[in-house]
């Protein structure tokens, strides 16, 4: 019995359905008894064309292969998506579930919890769906978004490093973006450790979000901020509250803007350039420029009308002389340096810096100040001189340190005080004191401390070859020659007897005619006791001698046991003021009230002091 439904069902593809696979049917009739009949019938058969010997047509087998490969590729892509991408439901789960992973997954930013339903959510539903669709498409096309952002900055740095000259490339980008050269706005600092309050910084390829955040983060550091972003360059003018070096500024901006040092140029601005000041001033009016704080003084000076008027003021030499006189600047280098420092606040100092004859003005100013000081000194008595010099000494000391040291050297203090009184008043043949003794007894320390507090002058016999080595005697109330040797004693014995007598002598001065003066009180220190030298017997009556036989004592910390300081001498003079016959300053007009100093410039009645 046969079954018509028997056979193997096969779903052939298109192009392969010209034949079918058939299975032989089973029959109960056995052929064992019909073998003779089979042989008798011969080779003839009722089935014809059982085997097709014709050429086979190719059909659509190639298209089938392409479809199979496409399906296999889609399956592999789906497996990769399941591995590296998460569905929207997974993105909304708690962060704790994500931490339970075998390998790290790079996901886009997600919410911590499910969004609550509400009216606002329904309004934004269409926008959210559109945004989700765009996010999925972007992720599927480019891979992981955070990974791309992470390598963006590194790619920029690599591009810069590929340049043979990074600075030249940044300068070209800057000029292309802002239309002006970076070096036209700045002055160059060779050292990165030099400090300045104002800095011009330009950066390449900074993210917009970080630029916006820097506007708030820099407020605590800067008094004035000027910011303009012209992609890909960003320009800052930062006026810090305190001076900073290039290294400090670079580290600050690298932390705030997340940039590398190769993306940055930092130099101080040109403070005296009109074009540079106008660039910052007019740029602050641009709506695309962020400016916060008051304009720096150097911008106002060159842009505002009132500052321009002040800048046009002619230089007044008398104002400069008055400044040097009031501050007791007698040397040319001191006058030039300290007056130039006033250029930020003083119009006359600013005019001085803009003048082409600064060296001549400084020289003339120093000459005039010395003339005024010399005239003032000659008018003063020794009491007024000592009083003026002690007023500038600050701090407390004790007069006993001076007295103890004198007694330590086995000197009668009453005798010393009497001779010192005559010495200060410059009495004839009493105006020279010699302190002699072996080395390390404190001779130079004692005399130098006195010269320092009374602003005396020191003469060096090494300059005796010059005709002008005694010239400082004309500009002081007290002088010192330290470490007098036999050669110096010979010179004193031959040429300075009249001066030690207290008589008027002719003193040769450099670049001036010789002048008539009396020697001021003169201190001498020596290892030679001139009183025991018979060949200098003519000096015995002109010199008052004290011996320092004992070595100066020091404590265990190598500190002097006797403090011969300015404060000690101030206390000494104040304590023994009347014993030294120094006049009362109230009688000379100094009653403790502030007095008008010497005026060498024409001041306005209501002008500044």
UniProtKB/Swiss-Prot annotation:
Annotated positions binding ATP: 437-444
Lineage of the species this protein comes from: Viruses, Monodnaviria, Shotokuvirae, Cossaviricota, Papovaviricetes
InterPro entries membership: Helicase_SF3_DNA-vir, P-loop_NTPase, PPV_DNA_helicase_E1_C, PPV_DNA_helicase_E1_N, PPV_E1_DBD, PPV_E1_DBD_sf, Rep_E1_papillomaV, Znf_lg_T-Ag_D1_dom_sf
Keyword Hydrolase included in the entry's annotation: yes
Residues covered by region (DNA-binding region): 149-312
Gene it is expressed from: E1
Chain span(s) of sequence motif Nuclear localization signal: 81-83
Name of the molecule in the record: Replication protein E1
Annotated source species: Human papillomavirus 17
Domain SF3 helicase: 411-561
Superkingdom of source: Viruses
């Amino acid at each position: 019995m046969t079954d018509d439904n028997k056979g193997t069902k096969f779903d052939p593809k298109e192009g392969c359905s010209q034949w079918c696979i058939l299975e032989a049917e089973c029959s109960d009739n056995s052929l064992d008894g019909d073998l003779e009949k089979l042989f008798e019938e011969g080779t003839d058969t009722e089935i014809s064309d059982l085997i097709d010997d014709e050429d086979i047509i190719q059909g659509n087998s190639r298209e089938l292969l392409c479809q199979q490969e496409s399906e296999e590729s889609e399956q592999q892509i789906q497996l990769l998506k399941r591995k590296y991408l998460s569905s929207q439901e997974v993105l909304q789960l708690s962060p704790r579930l994500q931490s339970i992973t075998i390998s790290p997954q790079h996901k886009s930013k997600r919410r911590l919890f499910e969004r609550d339903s509400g009216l606002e959510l329904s309004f934004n539903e269409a926008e959210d769906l559109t945004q989700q669709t765009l996010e999925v498409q972007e992720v599927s096309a480019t891979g992981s978004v955070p990974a791309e952002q992470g390598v963006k900055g590194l790619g920029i740095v690599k591009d810069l490093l590929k340049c043979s000259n990074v600075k030249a490339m940044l300068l070209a980008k800057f000029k292309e973006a802002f239309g002006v050269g970076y070096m036209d706005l700045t002055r160059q600092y060779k050292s990165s450790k030099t400090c300045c309050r104002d800095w011009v910084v330009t950066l390449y390829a900074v993210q917009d979000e970080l630029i916006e955040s820097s506007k708030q983060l820099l407020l605590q550091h800067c008094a004035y901020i000027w910011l303009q972003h012209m992609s890909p360059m960003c320009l800052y003018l930062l006026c810090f509250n305190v001076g900073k070096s290039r290294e400090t500024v670079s580290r600050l901006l690298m932390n705030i803007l997340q940039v590398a040092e190769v993306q940055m140029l930092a130099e101080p601005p040109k403070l005296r350039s009109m074009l540079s000041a106008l660039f910052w001033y007019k740029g602050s009016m641009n709506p695309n420029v962020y400016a916060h704080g008051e304009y720096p003084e150097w911008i106002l000076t060159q842009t505002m009308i009132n500052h321009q008027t002040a800048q046009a003021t002619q230089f007044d030499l008398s104002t400069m002389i008055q400044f040097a006189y009031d501050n007791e600047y007698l040397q040319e280098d001191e006058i030039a340096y300290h007056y130039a420092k006033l250029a930020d606040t003083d119009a006359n100092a600013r005019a001085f810096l803009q003048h082409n004859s600064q060296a001549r003005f400084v020289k003339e100013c120093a000459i005039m100040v010395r003339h005024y000081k010399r005239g003032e000194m000659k008018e003063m008595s020794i009491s007024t001189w000592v009083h003026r010099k002690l007023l500038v000494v600050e701090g407390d000391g004790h007069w006993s340190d001076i007295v103890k040291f004198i007694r330590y050297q086995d000197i009668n203090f009453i005798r010393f005080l009497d001779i010192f009184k005559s010495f200060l008043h410059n009495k004839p043949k009493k105006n020279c004191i010699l302190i002699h003794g072996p080395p390390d007894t404190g001779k130079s320390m004692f005399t130098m401390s006195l010269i320092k507090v009374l602003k005396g002058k020191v003469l060096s016999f090494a300059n005796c070859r010059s005709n002008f080595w005694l010239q400082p005697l004309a500009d002081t109330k007290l002088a010192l020659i330290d470490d007098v040797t036999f050669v110096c004693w010979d010179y004193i014995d031959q040429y300075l007897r009249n001066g030690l007598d207290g008589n008027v002598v002719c003193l040769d001065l450099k670049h001036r005619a010789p002048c008539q003066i009396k020697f001021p009180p003169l201190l001498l220190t020596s290892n030679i006791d001139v009183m025991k030298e018979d060949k200098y017997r003519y000096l015995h009556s002109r010199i008052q001698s004290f011996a320092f036989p004992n070595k100066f004592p020091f404590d265990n910390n190598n500190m002097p046991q006797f403090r011969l300081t300015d404060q000690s001498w101030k206390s000494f003079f104040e304590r023994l003021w009347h014993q030294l016959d120094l006049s009362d300053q109230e009688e000379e007009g100094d009653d403790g009230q502030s007095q008008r100093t010497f005026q060498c410039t024409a001041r306005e009645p209501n002008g500044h002091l």
